[in-house]
Every structure is written in structure tokens, then in C-alpha cells.
Amino acid sequence: LPLGGTARGTKGAPPSAGADKARQIFVSIASYRDEYLPFTIDSALSQAVHPDRLTFGICWQADEGESLARFVDDPRFRIRRYPYQASLGYGWARAEGQRLYDGEKYHLLIDSHSAFAPGWDESLIAQLEGKPGAKPLLTTSSPPFTFDAAGNVVLPWAGTEQDGVPLMTCGVIRPAGWLDIQMSRERKVERHQQTPFICCNFVFTHGAWIRDVPED
């Protein structure tokens, strides 16, 4: 895929032929020279119960030495590639990725350096559909992770069942108006809480959100 180009996979059957859009998840990723982007994609696919129901919209800000060749021809992928020097920031990059949305029922907005839990796709859909209201949205600041000597993902906390869910808090409002969003490991809960914040490194909701509240 040349710099400045857009690719949609053409080999094989398109996802809509094997999976109804009413069950699909559109995974939107903005990546800026992130060496973990291929890992993030592989993790999403390998840990999903239904990888055939995933589609990806990626704004890939890269140099000529970076490659996503093994994904370019996959019909689940829609990729816009830009020279990293031409980047206009993360808001612009997320907007570019979301412009590749094509009517999938669900939308996951995720960082390009993310690790996925087994069965994440069915789990997120069940959590979302169990919430009241016409337009529920799940969001948090995703926990950091590292790798052990064998290359396995190591998380600082295990998740809902073992440790509870760390709360997203705002400890500081900076002079320029920025909110300093942090995760509180001391305050953990066993169920979802309402929050005044959205953290764009993890948002899961219905796909209509892209059209109702587009990134700019």
C-alpha cells in the first residue's frame, strides 16, 4: 500500500457475505508509527469468538519501512495510509479511520497498542446490550500491559472477575482546559458506573455513534 493510499481487501468473500452486518463489529484504529499495531490486530482476531464478524478501519501513519502487507488483501480491512510527517493529530487520525465505517452494528474505538481478552467480542456485546437506554456506551482508560520472557501478555490487574474494574477519574484540570484522566487502582467496582468522561483509547458502542458524534 503506497503512502497516501487507501486499501480495501479484495481477496476472498467480503465479511458481509459470511456475517450479517447486524452482528459485525467495526474496529477503528488510529496508529502513528506504532510497532505494536500488528500485535493489536492479531490479538483482536485471535481472541475473538467470531473473527469473521470483525472489520477494521485503520488510519495508518507510517514510514516507508513499515508494512501491513499481510492484512491489505483481507476483505475485513480498510486501511488509509499516510506519511507520518503529514499527520494532523490524533483527532484527525481517528476521524479518518471512522470514515471507513460501512454500517456495522457495533463500533470499537481502540488504541493501536492494545491486548484483547478471550471472547472479548461476545463479552462486550452482552455488556452493552444489558445496559438501559437507547444509546449506551462503554468506555475506560485501558490498563497498560507488558510481555514476559515468553512473549505472553502481562496485565497489572486481571479484570472484572478477579480484581474488579478500575475506575476512571479526573484528578487534575490543567490550565489549558485539559482533563488529566487517570485510572484509580484503589477504587475498584464490580459493575459499570456512569461517568462524565469518555476515554478514546477504549469506546464500545453501537455503530450509529460514528454518525451521531463523529470525530473531528
Residue ranges and their predicted role:
Residues 9-216:
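Catalytic cores of eukaryotic secretory-pathway lumenal/extracellular enzymes that build
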